[in-house]
Design a protein with these regions (language model features):
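Juxta-kinase regulatory segment immediately upstream of eukaryotic protein kinase catalytic domains
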Residues: 9-43
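Broad phosphate/nucleotide-binding scaffolds in NTP-utilizing and phosphate-metabolizing enzymes
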Residues: 10-24, 56-68, 72-84, 101, ...
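An alpha-helical support segment within catalytic cores of ATP-dependent transferases
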Residues: 29-37, 164-167, 183-226
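ATP-binding glycine-rich phosphate-binding loop
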Residues: 42-58
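Active-site acidic catalytic loop and adjacent metal/ATP-binding pocket
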Residues: 53-64, 69, 104, 209-228
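A conserved alpha-helical element in kinase catalytic cores
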Residues: 72-123, 140, 145-149
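A glycine-centered beta->alpha junction motif in the catalytic cores
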Residues: 110, 122, 126-140, 183-191
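A cross-family kinase active-site recognition segment
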Residues: 140-197, 219-221
Length: 228
C-alpha cells in the first residue's frame, strides 16, 4: 500500500500553467464574444461568465428573455469528440421523455460548431446551446426514494443513448485517460524531484505495465468518466 503523501511542492510553481495546455481554460473576454455572437449566430446578447474546469462558459441572454450557454472548448478538444458530444445530447433528448437536455443552437451556416482563434493563436471550437434552468443535485433536498429512482432511470437512459452511437469513442490524450498513462508519466516524471515519490510512481507504472496494459485491448472503453 502506498503511504499518503504530505503536502509539499513537487512541481515548479508555474509548471501547470506553462506546460499542460489541456488544463488551461480559454481566455476570451466578453468584449471579444459579443460581436462574435452577432456575427456567427445573429444574436444580440449580454454575457456573464460561468464556472468551467477546462472550457470557458458564458450565460448569453437576449432582450426578449431567451437564454443560452456559449461554450468555448479547451484548445486540446478535437472536433470529432465535440461532434460525438452533440450526438449524445441529441440521442439522449429523444429517449428522455421527461428529461430536459440542452439543445444545440446552430450558427448562421447551420453548423453546430464554429472555429474561433484566440489572441495567442490557439484554435478553439465554439457552440451555443439553449440554457436549462435548475438546481444542482448537491443543493437539492430532500433526496427521496422517488427522486433517486428517477435519477437512476435517467442515468440508464443516457447510457442507452450513448450505446446507440455507432462509432468507438474517439482517441483522446487527456492526462487522466489511463490508456495514455505510459507516455504521460514518461513525459512528466522528470519534474518529480522527490526520489521517494519518484520511486512510488515508477513502481506503480511498472505494475500497471505488467498487469493491466496487456488486457487493455480487450476492455471496453467508456465515453464518459463516470463521475456523474
Amino acid at each position: 500500500m502506498i503511504p499518503p503523501i504530505k503536502h509539499k511542492t513537487i512541481f515548479p510553481a508555474n509548471y501547470m500553467k506553462n506546460t499542460i495546455p489541456e488544463l488551461e481554460r480559454p481566455a476570451f473576454s466578453v468584449q471579444d464574444l459579443i460581436p462574435l455572437l452577432e456575427e456567427r449566430y445573429g444574436l444580440c446578447c449580454t454575457l456573464e461568465e460561468l464556472p468551467g474546469e477546462r472550457d470557458q462558459n458564458f450565460l448569453a441572454q437576449e432582450k426578449n428573455g431567451e437564454t443560452y450557454v456559449l461554450k468555448i472548448s479547451n484548445s486540446c478538444e478535437t472536433l470529432e469528440f465535440l461532434q460525438v458530444q452533440n450526438d449524445g445530447l441529441e440521442r439522449s433528448a429523444k429517449l428522455l421523455k421527461n428529461g430536459r437536455v440542452p439543445k444545440v443552437f446552430p450558427n448562421k451556416n447551420g453548423e453546430s460548431l464554429s472555429s474561433v482563434m484566440s489572441e495567442d493563436g490557439g484554435q478553439h471550437w465554439m457552440r451555443l446551446v439553449y440554457y436549462i434552468d435548475g438546481i444542482p443535485m448537491a443543493e437539492y433536498s430532500p433526496h427521496t426514494r422517488d427522486f433517486l429512482l428517477e435519477l437512476g432511470s435517467m442515468c440508464g437512459t443516457v447510457t442507452k443513448a450513448l450505446h446507440e452511437i455507432p462509432d468507438s469513442p474517439p482517441s483522446r490524450t487527456l492526462l487522466w485517460e489511463m490508456h495514455n498513462v505510459q507516455e504521460t508519466m514518461e513525459e512528466y516524471m522528470p519534474w518529480i524531484k522527490d526520489k521517494k515519490l519518484l520511486g512510488w510512481v515508477k513502481n506503480s507504472l511498472d505494475l500497471y505495465s505488467r498487469t493491466i496494459e496487456p488486457l487493455e485491448s480487450k476492455l471496453r472503453r467508456g465515453w464518459i468518466h463516470n463521475d456523474f
